[in-house]
């Protein structure tokens, strides 16, 4: 008997970088939001071996895939001889700022904990998730949350309204490490106001949510890839209420009042050289 799980992507409604730590990581404060766009993992038990196959968007099934890393970490920590055959249907663009790899790792931890009957608590899984990447703990929890530390310290918020989202992922990827290297903490632009964004979400005020969108990494990635500014402008022109880059990029998203509006507006968007999708907050 196998298990089938959805692994939802995320966007950042705010992203602030507070400090650089001695270990090279950065202290952040950000509001993260799960979105309807998701990968699908199908997991079946087999003896000892862990194998991975992938369909959909092309990604490596080699050892550096976070699905395999998560499975092997759980296998090692649990001391189990059980294995798993994992199939990943990849729908979330890679190197996009949408946590595509992180959410697959989180779903793997969740799925194998159930399949192998390990009985690990959510907190135990969260500690393992932190070892796999800064976005993995949020992806494990999902929903709407403030993330602090390197992203592992989560404060769950009330679920956000199901605002519509248009996602535009250019053909190029972006290295998160390079973006952070290009960040100058003394020269940050608009800083997010976390409290104001939380209030806007609670009041379901799309206009105010749009005004509070802020990501201090955006200016760095825009310098590297000026085309992103053009994409932002097009999203504004077709009627998106607010526009921002997610994570370290390069995906840019536009907000609308609901999923139907996102689907309607997307028809007016030129798609040349970009991966364009309509989604909503979940």
UniProtKB/Swiss-Prot annotation:
Signal sequence annotation: none
Organism (species): Desulforamulus reducens (strain ATCC BAA-1160 / DSM 100696 / MI-1) (Desulfotomaculum reducens)
Protein name: 4-diphosphocytidyl-2-C-methyl-D-erythritol kinase
Pfam families tied to this protein: GHMP_kinases_C (PF08544), GHMP_kinases_N (PF00288)
Binding site for ATP: 93-103
HAMAP family linked to this entry: IspE
EC identifiers of the protein: 2.7.1.148
Transmembrane feature ranges: none
Catalyzed reaction equations: 4-CDP-2-C-methyl-D-erythritol + ATP = 4-CDP-2-C-methyl-D-erythritol 2-phosphate + ADP + H(+)
Keyword Transferase tagged: yes
Record keywords, A-Z: ATP-binding, Isoprene biosynthesis, Kinase, Nucleotide-binding, Transferase
Function description: Catalyzes the phosphorylation of the position 2 hydroxy group of 4-diphosphocytidyl-2C-methyl-D-erythritol.
Gene3D superfamilies: 3.30.230.10, GHMP kinase, C-terminal domain (3.30.70.890)
């Amino acid at each position: 008997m196998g298990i089938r799980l959805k692994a939802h992507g995320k966007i950042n409604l705010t992203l602030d970088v507070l400090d650089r730590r001695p270990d090279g990581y950065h202290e952040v404060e950000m509001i993260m939001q799960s979105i309807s766009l998701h990968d699908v993992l199908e997991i079946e038990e087999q003896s000892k071996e862990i194998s991975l196959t992938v369909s959909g968007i092309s990604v490596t099934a080699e050892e550096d895939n976070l699905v395999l890393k998560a499975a092997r970490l759980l296998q090692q920590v649990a001391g189990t001889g059980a294995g798993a055959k994992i199939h990943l249907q990849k729908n979330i663009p890679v190197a996009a700022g949408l946590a595509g790899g992180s959410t697959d790792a989180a779903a793997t931890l969740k799925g194998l904990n159930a399949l192998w009957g390990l009985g690990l608590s959510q907190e135990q899984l969260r500690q393992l998730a932190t070892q796999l990447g800064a976005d993995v703990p949020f992806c494990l929890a999902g929903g709407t949350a403030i993330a602090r530390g390197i992203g592992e310290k989560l404060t769950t918020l009330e679920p956000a309204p199901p605002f519509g989202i248009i996602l535009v992922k250019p053909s190029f990827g972006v290295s998160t490490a390079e973006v952070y290297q290009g960040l100058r903490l003394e020269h940050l632009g608009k800083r997010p106001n976390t409290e104001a964004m939380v209030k806007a979400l609670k009041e379901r005020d799309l206009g105010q949510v749009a005004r509070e969108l802020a990501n201090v990494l955006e200016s760095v990635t825009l310098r590297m890839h000026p085309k992103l500014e053009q994409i932002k402008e097009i999203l504004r022109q077709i009627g998106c209420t607010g526009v921002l880059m997610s994570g370290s990029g390069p995906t840019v998203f536009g907000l609308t009042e609901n999923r139907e509006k996102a689907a309607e507006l997307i028809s007016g968007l030129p798609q040349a050289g970009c991966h364009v999708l309509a989604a909503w907050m979940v």
